[in-house]
């Protein structure tokens, strides 16, 4: 063998090139579609690569993670929503493994079907409430100064009304007007009932509260999902506790010859006893929260309105008027639970990003607010 043949470098096989292309495709699929963190993208990359709106994030302290091409989202915080989801999944799986067959043949198949329906609906509403757009308002719509490409600082002081709450015109003499407030961070006039969430750092339509267990704001577009999630979660826990209770104490009917005492029953069916205790403990927080939101929706109030204007207000001069109350409990309940349409998203994350779109640009807060 000659020296040239001995030290020559063979070309890379086509299989190796195809493997590298596959790895690159998988990496792009995972980081750009399946799970996307816009803060990890290189600044200015949207100018070279055709990007979607969810892949562009220039605002400070706005930390979202997007899933499935921007169709789902979650705030970059402690993953308490993951713990909540696991706490819903595990009891359902244990039920189907250890309880479903026994209930099907010893009690009634319809109970298994009913619980499965409750569980699936709970999971569905959990995903919708925790990972959908709650009604985020677009930024930089009402900027009180001219914008140039080189500088995004205010050119002049904005008018005084940008620093005060103004009231819309109203007819009734015994009612106060609906107040509007300008958000210095988002640079928009907020619609009535909208509020700025300090966690999401965004203005939300009909902002109710920021739920740490769902890791998402609860607003106009997902409040209905939140209500039904609470309802079916409570119903599922009650049904599971009853089913597990029946299984544990089935020996009392004299139909279980191998079990004669409570100790022997929980020794033979430990998962049934565990599910019974788990479902009862799981009711401690969701059940009172459900009752509280039934009360709020009966008056068409939000959580923020109740705690800021109703609860603990002793000064008669600070009279709060709920302009959204229809004065009918049933109509208020219908509006919040069934009647109100979800509406469309004002910031469509799946649309193609247009370079220079002011909604996604970083602008400094107004000077009077930042001082």
Swiss-Prot record:
Domain DHHC: 181-231
Positions on the Cytoplasmic side per record topology: 1-79, 128-225, 296-371
Enzyme Commission code(s) on record: 2.3.1.225
One biological process term in Gene Ontology: protein targeting to membrane
Pfam families: DHHC (PF01529)
InterPro entries xrefs: Palmitoyltrfase_DHHC, PFA4/ZDH16/20/ERF2-like
GO molecular function: protein-cysteine S-palmitoyltransferase activity
Catalytic activity entry: L-cysteinyl-[protein] + hexadecanoyl-CoA = S-hexadecanoyl-L-cysteinyl-[protein] + CoA
Lumenal side: 101-106, 247-274
Active site: 211 (s-palmitoyl cysteine intermediate)
Transmembrane residue ranges: 80-100, 107-127, 226-246, 275-295
Top-level lineage group: Eukaryota
Primary localization class, coarse: endoplasmic reticulum
Cell compartment(s), UniProt: Endoplasmic reticulum membrane
Keywords for this protein: Acyltransferase, Endoplasmic reticulum, Lipoprotein, Membrane, Palmitate, Transferase, Transmembrane, Transmembrane helix
Cysteine-cysteine disulfides: none
PTM entry text: Autopalmitoylated.
Topology of this chain in the membrane: Multi-pass membrane protein
Any one of the GO CC terms: cortical endoplasmic reticulum
Function: The ERF2-ERF4 complex is a palmitoyltransferase specific for Ras proteins.
Listed PANTHER family: PALMITOYLTRANSFERASE APP (PTHR22883:SF43), ZINC FINGER DHHC DOMAIN CONTAINING PROTEIN (PTHR22883)
This protein's domain notes: The DHHC domain is required for palmitoyltransferase activity.
Record family assignment: Belongs to the DHHC palmitoyltransferase family. ERF2/ZDHHC9 subfamily.
Subunit structure: Interacts with ERF4.
Protein name listed in UniProt: Palmitoyltransferase ERF2
Organism, scientific name: Debaryomyces hansenii (strain ATCC 36239 / CBS 767 / BCRC 21394 / JCM 1990 / NBRC 0083 / IGC 2968) (Yeast)
Taxonomic path: Eukaryota, Fungi, Dikarya, Ascomycota, Saccharomycotina
